[in-house]
Amino acid sequence: MRVKKDDLVEVISGKDKGKRGKVLKVLPRENKVVIQGVNIVKRHQRPIPQLREGGIIEREAPIYASKVMLVCPNCDKPTRVGMRFLDDGAKVRFCKKCGEIVDKA
């Protein structure tokens, strides 16, 4: 997976198409990601007297990683990501549109 926690991504398909958000959690075994403010679902929660009250709560549900693209911080557009090795041997991600390094992988 080319997406990591705290990356800014944009949804490219589905009901939340066009929304941007920060990656809260990456689930590599399921090939899914949880994004802040995207794919909001309602869950019915029973009250636990010592911990929390019950009711209907809203939270983010995971979506497939293939439905999101990383937003390049340099050109501010959704882009595909490539991998490259620097001269010192460090593996980094780079933007396929502008060629700039996104961050170290």
From Swiss-Prot:
Gene3D superfamilies cross-referenced by the UniProt entry: 2.30.30.30
GO biological process: translation
Native source organism of the sequence: Pseudothermotoga lettingae (strain ATCC BAA-301 / DSM 14385 / NBRC 107922 / TMO) (Thermotoga lettingae)
Function in brief: One of two assembly initiator proteins, it binds directly to the 5'-end of the 23S rRNA, where it nucleates assembly of the 50S subunit.
Domain of life according to the entry: Bacteria
Complex and partners: Part of the 50S ribosomal subunit.
Stored PROSITE patterns: RIBOSOMAL_L24 (PS01108)
Family: Belongs to the universal ribosomal protein uL24 family.
InterPro entries: KOW (IPR005824), Rib_uL2_dom2 (IPR014722), Ribosomal_uL24 (IPR003256), Ribosomal_uL24_CS (IPR005825), Ribosomal_uL24_KOW (IPR041988), Translation_prot_SH3-like_sf (IPR008991)
Keyword RNA-binding tagged: yes
Keyword terms, alphabetized: Ribonucleoprotein, Ribosomal protein, RNA-binding, rRNA-binding
Record's protein name: Large ribosomal subunit protein uL24
HAMAP family noted in UniProt: Ribosomal_uL24_B (MF_01326_B)
One GO cellular component, as annotated: ribosome
Gene Ontology molecular-function annotations: rRNA binding; structural constituent of ribosome
A Pfam family annotated for this UniProt entry: ribosomal_L24
